[in-house]
């Protein structure tokens, strides 16, 4: 199976984690698009979705799925999203689609986080994929200097403005051995909206697409 077929496979597998009558948290990205397409097939059995991005909201509405604002719900039974990297403990790098802040907001509402990804996203240590960081424009240079002190290079993602009107720095040259400590530190830097390490909101389950089928990892 190619990568697109693996994404379709895990997108469909994630339906098993959607309770009947529920509002489901929906992430952002190409793998999530496959989940949204699958979700459309059972839309009569759910109340709707809370979306983490404008793009996902548009796709959900195109499929006839009702979209609720995050502020309108107190909790969600499940949040389903992809990952750019996931480690053996369920910690992730996310934000390749520039929706990391809203993804964390929706993930925080959810009782469990189900990650859907192909097998290439499973790594021993986070950091090979460029780490996205959402930042205020006036703080870009300061934050770049902070990462330089860590031996990393932070580059502004050209032509990208987040749904929150901010910029994305992509950081290369990191090896994140303690994701929780790293997330906590970077989130305290003035001007950082959020860093794309998901350790406080790590996956409960990962549905990993492999040539042999879906492999379920529980954390």
From Swiss-Prot:
Catalytic activity: aldehydo-D-ribose 5-phosphate = D-ribulose 5-phosphate
Enzyme class per UniProt: isomerase
A GO term from the CC aspect: cytosol
Top-level taxon in the UniProt lineage: Bacteria
Gene Ontology terms describing biological process: D-ribose metabolic process; pentose-phosphate shunt, non-oxidative branch
InterPro entries the record matches: NagB/RpiA_transferase-like, Ribose5P_isomerase_typA_subgr, Ribose5P_isomerase_type_A
Keyword Lipid metabolism: no
EC numbers on record: 5.3.1.6
A single MF term (Gene Ontology): ribose-5-phosphate isomerase activity
Keyword Translocase: no
Keywords: Isomerase
Residues forming the catalytic site: 103
Biological or metabolic pathway of the protein: Carbohydrate degradation; pentose phosphate pathway; D-ribose 5-phosphate from D-ribulose 5-phosphate (non-oxidative stage): step 1/1
Binding site for substrate: 28-31, 81-84, 94-97, 121
Subunit structure: Homodimer.
Family: Belongs to the ribose 5-phosphate isomerase family.
Function: Catalyzes the reversible conversion of ribose-5-phosphate to ribulose 5-phosphate.
Protein name per its UniProtKB record: Ribose-5-phosphate isomerase A
Lineage: Bacteria, Pseudomonadati, Pseudomonadota, Betaproteobacteria, Burkholderiales
């Amino acid at each position: 199976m190619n990568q697109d077929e693996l994404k379709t496979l895990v997108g469909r597998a994630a339906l098993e984690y959607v309770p009947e009558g529920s509002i489901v948290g929906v992430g952002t990205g190409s793998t999530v698009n496959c989940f949204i397409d699958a979700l459309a097939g059972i839309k009569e059995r759910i109340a709707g979705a809370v979306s983490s991005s404008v793009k996902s909201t548009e796709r959900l509405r195109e499929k006839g799925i009702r979209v609720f604002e995050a502020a309108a719900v107190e909790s969600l039974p499940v949040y389903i999203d992809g990952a750019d990297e996931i480690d053996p403990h369920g910690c992730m790098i996310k934000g390749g689609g520039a929706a990391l802040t809203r993804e964390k907001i929706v993930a925080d509402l959810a009782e469990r986080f189900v990650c859907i990804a192909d097998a290439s996203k499973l790594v021993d240590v986070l950091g090979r994929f460029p780490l996205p960081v959402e930042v205020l424009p006036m703080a870009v240079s300061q934050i770049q200097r902070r990462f330089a002190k860590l031996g990393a290079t932070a580059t502004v993602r050209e032509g990208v403005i987040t749904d929150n009107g901010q910029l994305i720095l992509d950081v290369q040259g990191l090896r994140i051995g303690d994701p929780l400590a790293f997330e906590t530190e970077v989130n305290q830097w003035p001007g950082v909206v959020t860093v794309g390490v998901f350790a406080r909101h790590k996956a409960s389950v990962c549905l990993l697409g492999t040539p042999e089928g879906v492999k379920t990892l529980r954390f």
